[in-house]
């Protein structure tokens, strides 16, 4: 885990990891900053820990957050298909969906649902080990806000 991630996440209340940890040490390191929830990814086979689940439905602030590793791309599916997928996996249509798998950073609004793929801090776009992206959400207002950050040696910048 890059030290830039630790710097960016300093002061956050909760950390949501959309999967593909590959090692539990990532959760241990992030856990020093706050509670960690992980959506089990295809790169997490064999990792057993209560902080990993196939899908999460969390109440954070006044919002419902659904988190899952595999989620259809909002640019490739209709909102009706995406809402059906949400109800199947979360039993509801949450305010925010956090997902991973593709390692492609993206923020899309799907009929009022904020769909966030933060990308990957270490394997962006499923390529070689290098600096990538993370996301940060602000849930203090009347609408959830998400910002993607690009990591680089010694820092980070909002996209």
Regions found by a protein language model. Give the residues of each.
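Divalent metal-coordination and catalytic microenvironments
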Residues: 15, 20, 30, 41, ...
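Helix-adjacent hinge/juxtasegments
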Residues: 37-88
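Active-site-proximal loop/helix segment associated with metal-binding centers of metalloenzymes
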Residues: 64, 73, 123-125, 154
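N-terminal active-site segment of His-dependent metallophosphoesterases
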Residues: 1-36, 48-53, 62, 130-131, ...
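Short, solvent-exposed aromatic-acidic interface loops
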Residues: 147-158
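Short, catalytically relevant binding-site loops at active-site mouths
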Residues: 22-24, 44-45, 72-74, 104, ...
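Short, flexible, glycine/charge-rich loop motifs used to bind or transfer phosphoryl groups or to couple energy/partner
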Residues: 3-7, 26-29, 55-56, 84-88, ...
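Conserved beta-sheet core of the metallophosphoesterase superfamily
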Residues: 37-39, 76-147
């Amino acid at each position: 885990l890059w030290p830039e991630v630790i710097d960016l996440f300093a002061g956050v209340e909760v950390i949501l990891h959309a999967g593909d940890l590959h090692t539990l040490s990532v959760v241990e390191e992030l856990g020093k900053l706050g509670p960690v929830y992980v959506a089990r990814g295809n790169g997490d086979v064999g990792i057993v820990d209560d902080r990993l689940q196939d899908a999460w439905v969390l109440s954070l602030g006044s919002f419902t957050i659904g988190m899952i590793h595999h989620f259809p791309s909002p640019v490739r599916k209709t909102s009706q298909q995406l809402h059906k997928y949400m109800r199947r996996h979360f039993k509801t249509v949450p305010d925010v969906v956090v997902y991973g798998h593709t390692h492609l950073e993206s923020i899309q609004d799907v009929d009022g649902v904020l769909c966030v793929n933060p990308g990957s801090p270490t394997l962006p776009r499923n390529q070689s080990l290098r600096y990538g992206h993370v996301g940060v959400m602000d849930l203090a207002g009347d609408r959830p806000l998400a910002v993607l950050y690009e990591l680089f040696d010694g820092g980070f910048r909002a996209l």
